[in-house]
Amino acid sequence: QWKNDAGMKPFDEFLTKYFPEGNRIDGSVMYGYTVAQGLVQVLKQCGDNLTRENVMKQAASIKNLELGGLLPGIKVNTSATDFAPISQVQLMKFKGETWELFGEILSGDVGG
C-alpha cells in the first residue's frame, strides 16, 4: 500500500543498494532504517562537535523532523524535558486489502 509513498522510495533504494536480502515488509527493517534516519539528523545537528555532551544535547533538540518510515505528517520532536520522540497518532481503518487514514493527526500528549 505504501510502495509509491515519497517516504518509501529512499527506503527501497537503500535496501536495494545495502541490504538487498532484507525483507521489505518486516517491521523491524523499517524501524531500524527510521531510527538510523533520526541518528543521521542528530549527527548533522552536532556539526564537528561530536562529544557525548553535544550528541545528547542535539538528541534532545529535535524539532519537527519528518522521517520516511513514519506516517505522512507525523513529526519527531524532543526537548531537554521530553525525550519521547513521537507524540502524535493517526487513525486508520482496514478496508479489505489496505489501510485508510482518516481524520486529522492527533496529539498523544497528556492534555494535548
Predicted regions mapped to residue ranges:
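Extracytosolic ligand-binding ectodomains
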Residues: Q1-G112
